[in-house]
Amino acid sequence: MNGSYQAPAWMNPYVSGQAVGYSQAVMAYADYYGVDGSADMEPEIDERISMVPCPMVSYASRTGTRRNLEAMRAANWRLLVSAKGVLRTEGMRYALDNGAWTAFQQGEAFDQRAFGRAVDLLGENADWIVLPDIVAGGMASLEFSLRWLDRLKGIPTKLLLAVQNGMQPDDVRELLSPAIGIFVGGDTEWKLGTMNTWGLLARRRNCHLHVGRVNSARRITLCAAAGVNSIDGTSATRFAKTLPPLDAALRHAYGQQDLFNPSSMALQQVRFDCRG
């Protein structure tokens, strides 16, 4: 890796227990009600509250045009800020991408310094942060992500583990919780073919499920049916005129969620092997 990483100073109070952030609070709440993910592996634990599906949240890559930005703001979409991009939020809610995909497209190695700078500036108030991964790296990517998970131990922000071609639910199962979720990457065929599996696993572990590069109404519908919590895409970023139909598809998909959506199922209804 290029350069050494030092956690930002703002993390210190959370690590020492002097401050309580989202991750610490949600895990305390989840533990009390038995929905911290441990019931997945320990059947004797009862979940003492029911899971209720929430509207799927949409993020779009940062845009440089005011028209596109205002269209996103009006539709209550959020920004997905890349660590390799411009580190501005434009006053909108946002999540932080690790920049690995951008670096991959540019033929570059993962930029540790850029990621560290982004976490320092924006990490504390992000909805979530994608842990660094290796594009098309398979299990080597997971090992890389786990090193970063250890480095960011104590962070108050929700973290997402990137899963991709070749990974199985049991590879990440025991890592997941309301504070550590899933980012579904990989190529399009693999992503669409395994989305329901990750939705079932997310329900069993009660963790956040995000799917990347969702740029059509059909894929939005598929994501909603799989119990996905959030999506991102670039279509709305590039063209303000494409945002209304995508947003309409998002709202329609939420309104049409059926009983097979895993996020609304009781734990006993979801198979441990995550096959639907």
Q: What would you call each of these model-derived segments?
A:
Residues 51-54, 153-160, 201-212:
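Short beta-strand/loop segments at the ligand-binding rim of alpha/beta enzyme cores
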Residues 97, 161, 223:
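Conserved, mostly hydrophobic/aromatic
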Residues 186-188, 224-250:
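Glycine-rich phosphate-binding active-site loops on the catalytic face of alpha/beta enzymes
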Residues 163-166, 208-218:
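Glycine-rich beta-to-alpha transition loops that act as phosphate-gripper elements at the mouths
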Residues 140-147, 167-177, 194-198:
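Distinct, well-ordered alpha-helical segments
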Residues 238-276:
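C-terminal helical cap(s) of enzyme catalytic domains, especially alpha/beta-barrels
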Residues 1-148, 252, 259, 270-276:
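Non-catalytic, usually N-terminal nucleic-acid engagement modules in DNA/RNA processing proteins
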Residues 110, 171-174, 215-230:
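Catalytic cores of alpha/beta
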